[in-house]
Amino acid sequence: MKYIYAGDAFQVVPSQRWSAEVPVEAFSIYRGLRTVNPSPYMYFLDFGDFQIAGASPEPLLTVTGRHVSTRPIAGTRPRGSSLEEDRRIADDLLADEKECAEHMMLVDLGRNDLGRVCAYGSVVVDELMQVETYSHVIHIVSSVSGTLRDDVGAMDALRSALPAGTLSGAPKEIGRAHV
């Protein structure tokens, strides 16, 4: 909090590493996750001595040819029990000053991340603060894109985006150094 009070950071995301040994096959957990929380981006990584399973509605980065994009997601609410309730929840979400401020911080981080690897003037916000509905939640989503410079490739773009702003806060350098 002292970095925020001092004006050095807008947001810092405290986190901790968590792991557990469980008496079930890791891939079974992944299959269960697919059933309980179907998401557009799911993964299972088996490194032999440990496994990682995850699900996200958010692609951190997409590179197709020289086109690069990121789709920040921030602002989340559980789905309602009807379409009418979903609409009310979406309206409330877009009216929530804190959620909108956090979302705009991530949009700005996305613009900054892409600006480090894209041709000057090519970075644009394609969509700003659209509401998307998923199986269990409603999110605020934006889209930022640009054209990669000739001297950089997909891995350079990925390095510019890591860590995701949802994990680091802003500015990223402060979040990485102090969390």
Where are these regions (language model features)?
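Extended alpha-helical targeting/anchoring segments
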Residues: 1-178
